[in-house]
């Protein structure tokens, strides 16, 4: 429901602001937008793995995720990396760096946890490592992720 309200208010805001000025454009919007890089020349994910582009036909999928407090994903892994940015709240990612990818039915164990907060720099999602993600905070978590995948290939593989 909150996603739909956010989308509705965004559309109302956009439709009410259809007039475009070309003079002093930067100063007109300086109170709304701050310029700055959220990721620059990233070559490694948070675990130190060097990322590479897919070998097949490249395909980018961008998603906005809104998770309520207490939400926890199932164990899964992504065959590809993605650029992620937390807009609101904090995202905790729990990694199992020891279980093989073909062990889909095996029990997973948290070996390492990383927490990313709103306002932090963007980060590369870890590819080919079992993990579960959660919102341990007291407010909705909103984050954006753009997956650098392959056409017609899954973005995630779930544990059984």
What is the role of each PLM region?
Residues 100, 117-120, 126-154:
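Ligand-binding loop in jelly-roll beta-barrel domains
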Residues 80-109:
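Glycine- and acidic-residue-biased ligand/ion/polar-headgroup-sensing regions
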């Amino acid at each position: 429901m909150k996603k739909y309200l956010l989308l509705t208010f965004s559309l109302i805001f956009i439709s009410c602001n259809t007039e475009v000025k070309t003079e002093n454009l930067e100063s007109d919007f300086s109170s709304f937008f701050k310029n700055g890089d959220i990721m620059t020349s990233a070559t490694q994910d948070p675990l130190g793995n060097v990322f590479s582009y897919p070998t097949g036909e490249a395909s980018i999928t961008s998603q906005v995720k809104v998770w309520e407090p207490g939400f926890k994903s199932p164990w899964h892994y992504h065959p590809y990396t993605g650029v992620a940015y937390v807009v609101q709240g904090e995202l905790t990612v729990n990694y199992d760096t020891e279980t093989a990818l073909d062990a889909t039915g095996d029990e997973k164990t948290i070996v390492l946890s990383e927490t990313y907060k709103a306002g932090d720099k963007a980060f590369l999602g870890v590819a080919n490592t079992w993990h579960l993600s959660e919102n341990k905070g007291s407010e909705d978590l909103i984050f954006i992720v753009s997956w650098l995948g392959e056409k017609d290939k899954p973005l995630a593989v779930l544990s059984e």
